[in-house]
From Swiss-Prot:
Interacts with the U3 snoRNA and is associated with the 90S and 40S pre-ribosomes. The gene is ROK1. It catalyses: ATP + H2O = ADP + phosphate + H(+). This is ATP-dependent RNA helicase ROK1. It is found in: Nucleus, Nucleolus. Residues 142-324 form the Helicase ATP-binding domain. The lineage of its organism: Eukaryota, Fungi, Dikarya, Ascomycota, Saccharomycotina. Coiled coil: none annotated. Its EC number is 3.6.4.13.
Length: 547
């Protein structure tokens, strides 16, 4: 439905005289049911991320209930009960499993009831939060974790990885919570690279924990943010009251060093976005975290991309028999994302291209635009604000509260275009993103996959456009390789580019291209300014010489 059609709906004027009676309607309120229906339609069209609750009339609720009752009975939930059925399932979803004695995947969440005696409250919470059918990574990882196996899991962005580890984590801890010899304190630890992702994981886990555990003693997750860390440090709260801790590496290491957090009861540690956590920037902190964990605990790693170097490190911390689950290609993007490369020539050409997209109606909200630096994000924000586009920005220079506010406004549809750096590229789930634009070519395949993974999530279709210039002749090969592995069409002349050497990959990742300033000003105007400055310098020098 076109929102502008809804807003501009009019009336048909009758010319047989009967319209006079209808004119009296101008003096009265519109019929409530009709007005409610229009309001609901408009609200739905502007609620990009489906965050608002519809205000249904009683009549509408009754009608929908009647339709539900008329639906045919659903078929029984699927169950995978033999190795042969598992092979068919894995071939269908391009699942590759490495390791001995891998358990059968589940066919449905109901399958967990018979196989693992799933906690009834957990199943109810899944249904309440509209998790009806497990995704391929959930089908494989849930039974693997419930069997106590260490796990390295790689699945496309938007494929449900958070629930893939949250469901078995809550189920395992829920059963222990009700036992007589249950330990007090943090029993599961989830580590994520960014505050935003950690907060999102906490919300997902919290929604699953409702009612799980003994009566009046539910599982208690905590988000180790600044506020919670201060309370722990000051003794206002004890870590013993929590069962699950969700945190970023630096915050956790700080709490471990000052003694405010104890991991002595830990049974499970989960590294989300493991490819980022096992890079050099986080390596020392991850080592400190692992050193604080009891020996022999269960370890799991999840990510959308797992390079060979990261996998090698991951294997070194695992038990002797970890399972490795790969959904699709470990360096490919989700199949639901249509990828496109646009040659812009130079920096001025990028501005022209994005403004042309705006004029032609291609910036269908909501849209995310990625840039390589904070300064460039700020500059593009100023340009698009001047163009009258409903845009905002988010980057590392902003406070956590300000970033959270911008994210909320974007989720609620108050902001249509969001400009950001890679701070938003990992894990943040905006389910309704229509378009991702890489204004600057990303510096690695992992960065590209995570950026465009903000769209095409949970089975929805999305688009990703990457601008590149003549300065990106080498960098663009990173994008081309991912596009090929994802089955996307690549122009012939780009297909013929020589493959990247390891040295080139390292240079691209560690040395960002020095790009010209983002500005509307024409080169001629810049030259005039330059000449004026030179003339001013000359005049000052002449004046100084005369003195």
């Amino acid at each position: 439905m076109d929102i502008f059609k809804v807003l501009s709906r009019g009336a048909t004027i009758q010319r047989n005289g009967k319209h006079r009676k209808d004119l009296t309607l101008l003096n009265h309120a519109a019929p409530k049911d009709t007005q409610d229906n229009v309001d609901i339609e408009v609200a739905r069209e502007t609620d990009f991320f489906k965050t608002k609750t519809d205000t249904y009339s009683k009549k509408r609720v009754a009608e929908e209930a009647e339709l539900d009752n008329e639906e045919e009975e659903e078929a029984p939930p699927p169950i995978i009960s033999t190795p042969e059925e598992a092979v068919v399932f894995r071939n269908k979803h391009k699942i590759n499993i490495t390791g001995e004695d891998s358990p059968l995947p589940i066919g449905s969440f109901e399958d967990l009831i018979t196989r693992f005696n799933l906690h009834p409250y957990l199943l109810a919470n899944l249904k309440k939060n509209k998790y009806t059918d497990p995704t391929p990574i959930q089908c494989e990882s849930i039974p693997t974790m419930l069997n106590g196996r260490d796990l390295i899991a790689c699945a496309p962005t938007g494929s449900g990885k958070t629930m893939a580890y949250s469901i078995p984590m809550v189920e395992m801890l829920g059963k222990k919570k009700g036992s007589k010899d249950a330990k007090k304190g943090i029993k599961a630890l989830v580590v994520a690279p960014t505050k935003e992702l950690a907060s999102q994981i906490f919300n997902a886990v919290f929604s699953l924990c409702v009612g799980v555990g003994k009566k009046k003693d539910e599982l208690k997750p905590c988000l180790l943010d600044k506020s919670t860390a201060d309370k722990l440090r000051n003794g206002k709260v004890s870590s013993q009251k929590y069962d699950i801790c969700i945190t970023t590496p630096l915050r956790l290491v700080s709490a471990l060093n000052d003694g405010s957090l104890d991991l002595g009861s830990l049974d499970l540690v989960i590294f989300d976005e493991a490819d980022k956590l096992f890079e050099k920037g986080f390596a020392t902190q991850v080592d400190d975290i692992l050193a604080a964990c009891p020996s022999g605990i269960q370890k799991t790693l999840f990510s959308a991309t797992i390079p060979a170097s990261v996998e090698q490190l991951a294997n070194s911390i695992m038990s002797t028999d970890p399972l490795r689950i790969i959904i699709g290609n470990k360096q490919a993007a989700a199949q639901t994302v249509e990828q496109k490369l646009v040659y812009a020539g130079n920096e001025e050409g990028k501005l022209v291209a994005i403004r042309q997209m705006a004029r032609e109606g291609q910036l269908v909200a909501p849209v995310i635009i990625f840039l390589q630096s904070i300064d460039r994000a700020k500059a593009l924000f100023k340009e698009l604000v001047f163009d009258g586009i409903n845009v905002d920005q988010i980057h590392g220079d902003m406070t956590a509260a300000k970033r959270a506010s911008v994210i909320d406004r974007f989720r609620n549809g108050e902001v249509w275009v969001l400009i950001c750096t890679d701070v938003l590229a990992r894990g943040i789930d905006f389910r309704g993103i229509n378009l991702v634009i890489n204004y600057d070519v990303p510096q690695s395949a992992q960065s590209y996959v995570h950026r465009i993974g903000r769209t095409g999530r949970a089975g929805r279709l999305g688009k990703a456009v990457t601008f590149f210039t003549k300065e990106d002749a080498t960098n663009v090969k990173v994008v081309v390789n991912v596009m090929k592995q994802s089955g996307q069409e690549v122009p012939d002349w780009l297909n013929n580019l020589a493959p990247l050497t390891q040295k080139e990959r390292d240079n691209i990742k560690n040395r960002p291209i020095k790009r010209k300033k983002i500005s509307t000003q024409h080169a001629l105007a810049n030259n005039k300014k330059k000449r004026a400055k030179q003339q001013m310098k000359g005049l000052k020098k002449m004046k100084k010489d005369d003195e």
